Amino acid sequence: MDFSDLKKPGKVFFTITDEPEIKNGFQLKDGLNIIDSDKEVPQEFDCDYKPIVPNXLYFSEPKYICEYMAYGIYLREVYLPDDPKLKITRMKNFPCGKSMMYGANMIILGKKHKLSDPETYEYIEKCGGKLRYDGDNALLMAAENGYYEVVTYLINKGCDPRSDYDYALRSAAEKGHIDVVKLLLEKGADISSHNHWPLSYAALEGKFEMVKFLISRGADVRAKNYNPIKYALDGGHREIADYMLDLCPEIGSVSDDDTYDSDSSDYSEDDSESIN
């Protein structure tokens, strides 16, 4: 496999890192990073059939980087060293068939950009990145982390607040980011999506103020046979359950043992209407 195009001097790649910046047990550092440089690295590795190669440092071309936003809080510039010992492998089908990631035994780690900063996304685009590549992962990540300014920027750039069955709204509600939830609703997100799952997951995670806010905006406590109440009980949040029970006098009392397995399979793509 010919990787000559990847090895062009000054060509920039990206990787996503967390805090601390450890990948596969390897502590990343600014500048040159070398890992297991004497081990054989296959030129192509199909992630559908094998586990991730443990002895590689991973990076992506700018076009695909938004596919990997959930993996951390920083965008790091990556460059490849001009070294005859450099070995590269193409990571096929990670995390899906449309994605393109590479691994190498050595990389040069460049500037760190915060994913909470809208300017980071401007830079991604400047480098050829697609903010909506294969969906709206960048928006979903920003909403989940409460990055209000980034959510605003991405929506203004064309990202869809209703993408993936309003998953951004559900994630922001689940994490208690009321300002982001308000923004998403203003931009067209549907509070009733998937049988009001923003309310159910806010209840599951014990976000009382979020629960009150969503109900004030029309979220249905009775959705799908009182799922939000069941989710509150499942999460051990009796106070939230009692608050919602007071809004449903027809139920009467419910014991703490009346819990619910909150697996997301409870929702299907066809499950979009409330069941009262």
From Swiss-Prot:
InterPro entries registered for this protein in UniProt: Ankyrin_rpt, Ankyrin_rpt-contain_sf
Signal peptide span: none
UniProt KW keywords: ANK repeat, Repeat
ANK repeats: 134-163, 164-193, 195-223, 225-253
PROSITE patterns listed in its UniProt record: ANK_REP_REGION, ANK_REPEAT
Pfam families: Ank_2
Region (Disordered): 254-276
Acidic residues compositional bias, start-end: 255-276
The protein, known as: Putative ankyrin repeat protein R838
Biological source species: Acanthamoeba polyphaga mimivirus (APMV)
